[in-house]
C-alpha cells in the first residue's frame, strides 16, 4: 500500500494533563504486568555477567509513555528486581509519538524518585515505536503497557462515498495489527540485548461462547455513539464527521497474538515466556460503591460523579480523533468552535451514559506477554 493511500496514526492522548488525570483503568491494567516485569528483570540478570554489563548503562525503555503517570511503578519494579551494581549508571528512556505532550511527561518525571542510589539519566524519545528508537544492543528491559492496540497507519475513510462495512474494516485492521506487532518485535530485537526482557500489555478482544465479540467498555462506547447521533440529528455535526470519525486501533484476540508470536522471525529472536489475558474493571466502580455506602441519600450525585469519571476516561483517548474528524469532515479550523463541539459531545455522552448505563461496570480485556531475547 503506497504512503499516499494510508493515514498515519498521529493523534496523541488528550494533553495538558487531562490524560494523566483520567487513566485509572490503565493503572489497574498495569498492576497485572508487574509480576511479568519482575520476572523479566530477574531473568535478564541471570543471563548476563555484571562485569561485562558495567561497560554500558543499565537501560530501561518504555514505549508509549504518554504523560508518564503509569511509568513509575513498572520501572521501580524492574530496579528492585534487578538491583544493578551501585557503580553502574542507569538510563531510563521514555518513548511516544512526536505529537505526545512531552512537556507534561517531563514535568511528571521530575517528581519521581527511584529506589536505588545509582546515577540515573533520563531521555525522552519522540518517535513512533513502529521504528527503531534506541541504538542496537543497548536496552536491558523494555515494556509497553496499554499502547500496542493503536495501529501504525490505516487507509483513511473518505468524508463522502461508500463506507466499508465493519467486517471489511476489521479484516483490514487485523492484518495491520499483525504486521505492526511483527514490525514492533523486529525493532525491539535490534535494541534489546541477548538475555534481555520485553513485557507487553494491550487491549484485547474476548469472544463469547458462540464466537461473538464482547465489547470492551460497552457503556461509555454506546453512550458516545448515541451522543454523536444526537448531534447529527440536531444538525450540529455533518454526516461527513461520522463517516471519518474512527479510532485506528485493533483489539487482538489471544489467537491473533499467538499467531503473530508463532511467525518464524519472532521464534528466531524471542523466547515466549508468558501469554495470557485478563479482565480489568475501571476502579471508579469500587469508589462508587464506597461513596454510596458512605452517603446513601445522594444517589444522583454519586451517579453523576461516576458517569463523569468513566466518560472522561474514554474521552482522554478518543477526544483527539473527534477533533480530527470535525476538522476533516466539516472543515472547521477555529479552535474555539472545535473546543465547543467537543465539550458538547462530552456533555451529551455523560447524559447518555446516565440514561442507559447508569452505574454499570466499565470492563476491558487485556492481553499480557513476556518475551526473552535469545
UniProtKB/Swiss-Prot annotation:
Pathway: Secondary metabolite biosynthesis
Keywords carried by this UniProt record: Magnesium, Metal-binding, Methyltransferase, S-adenosyl-L-methionine, Transferase
GO BP, sorted A to Z: methylation
Pfam families from the UniProt entry: Methyltransf_7
Residues bound to S-adenosyl-L-homocysteine: 19, 70, 96, 128-129
Matching Gene3D superfamilies: Methyltransferase, alpha-helical capping domain, Vaccinia Virus protein VP39
Enzyme Commission number(s) from the entry: 2.1.1.-
Leading EC class: transferase
GO MF term list: metal ion binding; methyltransferase activity
Induction note: Expression is positively regulated by the acurin A cluster-specific transcription regulator acrR.
Disruption phenotype: Abolishes the production of acurin A.
Binding-site residues, Mg(2+): 245
InterPro entries xref list: MeTrfase_7, MeTrfase_capping, SAM-dependent_MTases_sf
PANTHER family recorded: S-ADENOSYL-L-METHIONINE:CARBOXYL METHYLTRANSFERASE FAMILY PROTEIN
Role summary: O-methyltransferase; part of the cluster that mediates the biosynthesis of acurin A, a highly reduced polyketide coupled to a serine via a peptide bond. The activities of the highly reducing polyketide synthase acrA and the nonribosomal peptide synthetase acrB are collectively responsible for the synthesis of the acurin A core structure with a heptaketide backbone produced by acrA covalently fused to a L-serine by acrB. After the formation of the PK-NRP hybrid product, it is detached from acrB by reductive release to set up the formation of the lactam ring by aldol condensation.
Membership in a protein family: Belongs to the methyltransferase superfamily. Type-7 methyltransferase family.
Designated name of the protein: O-methyltransferase acrG
Amino acid at each position: 500500500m503506497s504512503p499516499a493511500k494510508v493515514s498515519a496514526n498521529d493523534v496523541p492522548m488528550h494533553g495538558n494533563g487531562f490524560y494523566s488525570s483520567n487513566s485509572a483503568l490503565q493503572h489497574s491494567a498495569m498492576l497485572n504486568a508487574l509480576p511479568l516485569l519482575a520476572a523479566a528483570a530477574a531473568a535478564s540478570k541471570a543471563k548476563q555477567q555484571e562485569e561485562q554489563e558495567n561497560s554500558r548503562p543499565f537501560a530501561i525503555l518504555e514505549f508509549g509513555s504518554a504523560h508518564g503517570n503509569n511509568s513509575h511503578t513498572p520501572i521501580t519494579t524492574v530496579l528492585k528486581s534487578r538491583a544493578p551494581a551501585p557503580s553502574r549508571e542507569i538510563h531510563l528512556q521514555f518513548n511516544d509519538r512526536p505529537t505526545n505532550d512531552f512537556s507534561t511527561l517531563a514535568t511528571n518525571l521530575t517528581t519521581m524518585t527511584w529506589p536505588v542510589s545509582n546515577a540515573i539519566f533520563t531521555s525522552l524519545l519522540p518517535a513512533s515505536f513502529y521504528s527503531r528508537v534506541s541504538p542496537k544492543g543497548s536496552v536491558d528491559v523494555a515494556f509497553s503497557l496499554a499502547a500496542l492496540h493503536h495501529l501504525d497507519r490505516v487507509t483513511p475513510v473518505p468524508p463522502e462515498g461508500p463506507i466499508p462495512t465493519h467486517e471489511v474494516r476489521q479484516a483490514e485492521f487485523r492484518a495491520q495489527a499483525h504486521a505492526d506487532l511483527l514490525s514492533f518485535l523486529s525493532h525491539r530485537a535490534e535494541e534489546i540485548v541477548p538475555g534481555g526482557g520485553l513485557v507487553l500489555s494491550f487491549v484485547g478482544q474476548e469472544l463469547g461462547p458462540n464466537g461473538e465479540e464482547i465489547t470492551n467498555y460497552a457503556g461509555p462506547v454506546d453512550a458516545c455513539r448515541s451522543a454523536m447521533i444526537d448531534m447529527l440529528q440536531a444538525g450540529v455535526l455533518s454526516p461527513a464527521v461520522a463517516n471519518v470519525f474512527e479510532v485506528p486501533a485493533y483489539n487482538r484476540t489471544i489467537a491473533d497474538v499467538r499467531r503473530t508470536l508463532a511467525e518464524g522471525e519472532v521464534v528466531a529472536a524471542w523466547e515466549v515466556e508468558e501469554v495470557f489475558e485478563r479482565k480489568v474493571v475501571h476502579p471508579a466502580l469500587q469508589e462508587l460503591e464506597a461513596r454510596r455506602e458512605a452517603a446513601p441519600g445522594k444517589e444522583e450525585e454519586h451517579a453523576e460523579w461516576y458517569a463523569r469519571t468513566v466518560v472522561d476516561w474514554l474521552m482522554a483517548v478518543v477526544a483527539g480523533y473527534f477533533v480530527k474528524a470535525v476538522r476533516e469532515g466539516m472543515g472547521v479550523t477555529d479552535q474555539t468552535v472545535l473546543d465547543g463541539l467537543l465539550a458538547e459531545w462530552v456533555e451529551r455522552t455523560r447524559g447518555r451514559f446516565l440514561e442507559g448505563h447508569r452505574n454499570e461496570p466499565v470492563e476491558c480485556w487485556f492481553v499480557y506477554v513476556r518475551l526473552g531475547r535469545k
